[in-house]
Every structure is written in structure tokens, then in C-alpha cells.
């Protein structure tokens, strides 16, 4: 029992979400585009989105999402979203200037009105 307690206390800092520190929680960005790739996995799932640019070619965005286990508990499966889906995504942008990365807060598929909202 003592060993288990020590292990939990020792590993607790690693449970902190280091990835969230990479994103600017004070700002929200919205992108709209086509899902090109989806990876539902642990520790974070990822969406690759070709977002419509205001002028010129579409920009490829990397959108980080929650872990597969968390998403599954919220009803999101590997087949919920598919490449080719048109999506509107809001999230916190990367703190790195010019990086096209978001931490997902909401995702909507306008074709059928499916929406997911949540996150840390």
C-alpha cells in the first residue's frame, strides 16, 4: 500500500497537462475547413484540417484534442468524424507565432449539426 501511495505521489506531476501550456488560453481562434486526417489516440487526439484562407490556398492546421479514453466516454468514436467532413472549430491558438495549431474547445459539423463542446 505504501508503495502504491509513493508511486502515485511521484507520478502526480506527470499527470499535469504540459501540452496546455503551449496554448494561449486568453484567446480563441475559429477555423473552418475540411478534415484531412483524424487520429483518436492517447495521450491526445489530433485533427488535421485544411482551413479556408481569406485569400490564397488553404492552410493546414493541427488541432489537438483530448485523449481517446476521454472522448469515448463522451460519445466520440473513431468513426464520429471522417476525412472530408466540413468542420468549424474553435480553440486556443498556439503561443508560437505563426504556428497553425489549436487546442480544441468546440467542433461543429454543419452538414448534420453535430457539435462537441468541452475540454480542460
Predicted regions mapped to residue ranges:
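Short, structured beta-strand/loop micro-motifs enriched in basic residues and often containing a Trp
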Residues: 65-73
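OB-fold/S1-family single-stranded nucleic acid-binding modules
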Residues: 94-120
Amino acid at each position: 500500500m505504501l508503495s502504491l501511495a509513493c508511486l502515485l505521489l511521484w507520478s502526480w506531476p506527470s499527470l499535469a497537462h504540459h501540452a496546455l501550456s503551449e496554448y494561449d488560453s486568453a484567446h480563441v481562434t475559429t477555423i473552418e475547413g475540411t478534415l484531412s486526417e483524424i487520429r483518436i489516440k492517447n495521450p491526445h487526439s489530433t485533427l488535421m484540417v485544411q482551413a479556408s484562407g481569406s485569400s490564397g490556398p488553404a492552410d493546414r492546421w493541427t488541432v489537438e484534442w483530448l485523449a481517446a479514453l476521454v472522448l469515448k466516454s463522451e460519445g466520440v468514436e473513431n468513426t464520429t468524424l471522417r476525412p472530408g467532413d466540413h468542420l468549424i472549430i474553435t480553440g486556443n491558438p498556439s503561443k508560437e507565432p505563426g504556428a497553425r495549431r489549436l487546442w480544441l474547445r468546440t467542433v461543429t459539423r454543419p452538414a448534420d449539426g453535430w457539435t462537441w463542446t468541452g475540454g480542460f
